[in-house]
UniProtKB/Swiss-Prot annotation:
It is found in: Cytoplasm. Its main location: cytoplasm. This is Argininosuccinate lyase. Keywords: Amino-acid biosynthesis, Arginine biosynthesis, Cytoplasm, Lyase. The keyword Signal does not apply. One of its GO terms (biological process) is L-arginine biosynthetic process. Coiled coil: none annotated. It holds the Pfam family ASL_C2. GO terms for cellular component: cytosol. The gene is argH. HAMAP family: Arg_succ_lyase. NCBIfam families: argH. GO terms for molecular function: argininosuccinate lyase activity. It catalyses: 2-(N(omega)-L-arginino)succinate = fumarate + L-arginine. It comes from Streptomyces avermitilis (strain ATCC 31267 / DSM 46492 / JCM 5070 / NBRC 14893 / NCIMB 12804 / NRRL 8165 / MA-4680).
Amino acid sequence: MSSNSGDVRLWGGRFADGPAEALAKLSASVHFDWRLAPYDIAGSRAHARVLHKANLLTDDELDRMLAGLDRLEADVADGTFVGTIADEDVHTALERGLLERLGPDLGGKLRAGRSRNDQVATLFRMYLRDHARVIGGLLADLQDALIGLAEAHPDVAMPGRTHLQHAQPVLFAHHVLAHVQALSRDAERLRQWDERTAVSPYGSGALAGSSLGLDPESVAKDLGFEHGSVANSIDGTASRDFVAEFAFITAMIGVNLSRIAEEVIIWNTKEFSFVTLHDAFSTGSSIMPQKKNPDIAELARGKSGRLIGNLTGLMATLKALPLAYNRDLQEDKEPVFDSCDQLEVLLPAFTGMMATLTVHRERMEELAPAGFSLATDIAEWLVKQGVPFRVAHEVAGECVKVAEGEGIELDGLTDEQFAKISSHLTPEVRGVLNVPGALASRDGRGGTAPSAVAVQLAEVRTDVAAQHAWATAKQKN
């Protein structure tokens, strides 16, 4: 077969004719798996070295093979060489490129002892491991922005909510750090996923391994897989749980971003007026000149659905596949490629939005005690006086009922009204009917007291610094 014929299929010897045009179009994946080309070439280098160790390439052949791969890599990087639909997939395209540079006698030797099945399983892991670190770094950048927001407003009180109703006053910094904690778990999931994925399927062949005396452990080390090669060649080529887990992590990141986004959207309304978005991270309306829209937050909400869809679509594809490799697995890449692409464009914009947010302290603190949010403080004050909590809860509820009927907040009740509600409500109860006191009293670990929040800040700074270090660590590709 001529390397210039445009037909260097990696199969076909037992077929009398080539595939139908409709099949070729259906089968083609080079338009989306071309992004794996650098990893394919790295794998080919490692494979050439084990072929040499097995005496299947001479010293001279290895040198020329590696030089040819270097030239091919450079041509791929600058766009001189690209895959085409006729190539079917990235592996076939790169074999064509190698044959064009080395000729069929030497270039054709690289196929020995490997299959596209173990190739793609390995390259896919390499690609996702690299992008896990990219996403991890972007997450850390967002966490830095949120930590900066908390540090800039350490003593601002706001209404804490459950069911979107006023619940108890909390520090704004405490609220923001709750989101940092959620993102820290996302980052931890990425690190743990990477640890599990650091095993190479290379050497598994189509499913049964190789009879050529090749060394999968050597390839694994060469490609930066810290835990060596897979223990079972069938599992190595057929499993895609690492893809599904990655898709879940990206979907969870999307969900966590959507929760922040929803709050920003609500807080930015005229009715709330808690925050104002920077002009550079807002958009306008084509007809209403007054509009300043939270598009980044809204797109984050929308893209979270897209990320969830990528996960669910992938899981449906993987369902009930028999061992080992099946062509269904061609469909495993686009969902997570898209998830990487979406997060890598969304996270920088989202970080910019949060880093430039203007917080309106007066409005937040105006509403912090509203909605009878200090009722729990009355109940807990009563408990400290020896009143059973069941009774204290009823008494505090009666205080709310009276205040609501009068159209006032709890601190507007008179001493006489308190005494009428319960003899336990002495004038000293007023000592807890203020937001600073309510905040300061919740000083246990994880609480909203300034002292507790300061501890949380110190802990997340350390955690995020470690995340940055992991994200910037280089793989040994």
